[in-house]
Amino acid sequence: MVHSNFDPDFDQLPTSIPIFPLPNALLLPGGQLPLNVFEPRYLAMVTYALASQTRLIGMVQPSGDSNVSDTGDDPLLFETGCAGRISFFQESDDGRFVIALNGVCRFNRIRQQLEPKGFLIADVDWKPFAHDLRIDLSSLDREPLIEVMKRYFKLKGFETDWAQIENSDNHQLLATLSMICPFAAVEKQALLEADSMAKRADLLMVMMEMALHKESGGNDARH
């Protein structure tokens, strides 16, 4: 994968980062996630991250039915998340922050605490995912993936620039596809935790095929 010159090296990753628990929001290393931030505690979180050297925010999905929007209580979260560097920041006239996160590296949460301003800070372990910061030169059989992708996009009514898809590198293709497809939270988490590009591609194909199979009522005949 390609990293920005602004991304930290592995030994520059901090021992703790602010956590943004957002349902069904998946960030992968090399992906980009736009966010519209308006709750006071998360405005404070973004301000905290901007003041840090690495400008990192950890994206973690809630693992249960806890509503992270209605209460400051500690929500139930998946253990593994992905840290994104704030690469774009803009203030709006109505008091929102519009930001974009560039995925840098996955992490496991060790422990966390609630800050006085209402957002979470977690001590994190980066070591299991040190390879996220290396360039992945793995090969990928793209044709079966793109064939399933075309049928899945047609099913969902998605429009895309197929020329751009064809020109994207393997890592970018998998990151973008994993992030934009409307999978369930547990499926998105499986994609996040996949330990290789090949396994993530296999998972994506299985998930899209299952959606196609379900829509067809179990009839897999193609026309």
Residue ranges and their predicted role:
Residues 165-183:
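Core structural elements
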